[in-house]
């Protein structure tokens, strides 16, 4: 009997504003998938002309086969760390997709047009209050994303974080990842 293997292709869009580490988060996610989980991955990014405060987007496509089209069309996973990003991208999500928002920064009064699983997590508050470093909210988010979606393994993500963050910040970033992973365990 000839069994056809189902291809796995997941499209992830991370969005927010400049200065939140959206691009770095996408790089870390792509690196975890490609280098440590032995998957195919491509990461693209775009941001406004402002150095900080403008729109920022990082997209990652992860597949178990070569990626023939590197752009995200209908994300399976959407992360929004700003209201502007949520308002702009909420209706792009695939039916049955997963949406993660920073509950302190994003109002979800207007839901996506399709059925999704929505997680509201205070990424920035966790980074500020528990790690005393608001800048690691993006890494808190990656912890929750990893736990909730299993898109990459926890171990691969930890290795990719160590590869990607500035020297001297590894411990704080791993703590941020761990906090995000733990808070998602309770959801």
UniProtKB/Swiss-Prot annotation:
Disulfide bonds: none annotated. GO terms for molecular function: 2-oxoglutarate synthase activity. InterPro entries: 2-oxoglutarate_synth_KorC, PorC_KorC, Pyrv/ketoisovalerate_OxRed_cat, Pyrv_flavodox_OxRed_cen. Its EC number is 1.2.7.3. It catalyses: 2 oxidized [2Fe-2S]-[ferredoxin] + 2-oxoglutarate + CoA = succinyl-CoA + 2 reduced [2Fe-2S]-[ferredoxin] + CO2 + H(+). Pfam families: POR. It comes from the Archaea. Keywords: Oxidoreductase. It is an enzyme of class 1 (oxidoreductase). Heterotetramer of the KorA, KorB, KorC and KorD subunits. This is 2-oxoglutarate synthase subunit KorC. The lineage of its organism: Archaea, Methanobacteriati, Methanobacteriota, Methanomada group, Methanococci. The gene is korC.
